[in-house]
């Protein structure tokens, strides 16, 4: 069944399935490592396998949010609209560092470059604000799913983009009104949105949006929502 479920994956996505994710408990304490494939198989998720992840919400200086549509070759939620960049820190020393979420923020820099072509001479660790954490569990299809504690990271900066079409079908900046209209279209069955993006928008982004010039009052690094 797994073999049949990966026929839409390209060489890049198949290679990434062998990357080592950080396995955690529900307090976000590291307890080991496992492959990205194993972490996203529903048979393992249903046994409790949980890993660390992150989502970046990237705003330009006009306070528009970069929304991407995931490539059709993605193993979970292909073709769905979602946040600016979401992925996983890897089980490597530089991405395991927990002080100030440095490891996760380094992983975000890596994936912003890989997915969106944002070179690291444009953006630094200091540009990435660790806002809070959110637990989520969702099923993509009979084989694949997500079971993560995601670090919510915020960037507000004008950046040059060069998306990798193997990762991103398309992306565009949206106003708060545009995002609400996207959610409304999804509710009518006209669009597909990842479950974590919908909950992120409704639980956090609409509250943060009017305060993007200074989000310090919303920073909750010790909190894990959704548990």
Swiss-Prot record:
Presence of keyword Lipid biosynthesis: yes
Concerning CDD domains, the annotation shows: NUDIX_IPP_Isomerase
State what protein this is by name: Isopentenyl-diphosphate delta-isomerase 2
What gene codes for this chain?
Idi2
What's a single GO MF annotation on this record? metal ion binding
Q: Per UniProt, where does substrate bind? A: 36, 70, 74, 87
Q: Where is this motif: Microbody targeting signal?
A: 225-227
Q: What is its EC number?
A: 5.3.3.2
Q: Which PROSITE patterns match?
A: NUDIX (PS51462)
- Source organism per entry reads Mus musculus (Mouse)
Q: In this protein, which residues make up the domain named Nudix hydrolase?
A: 49-199
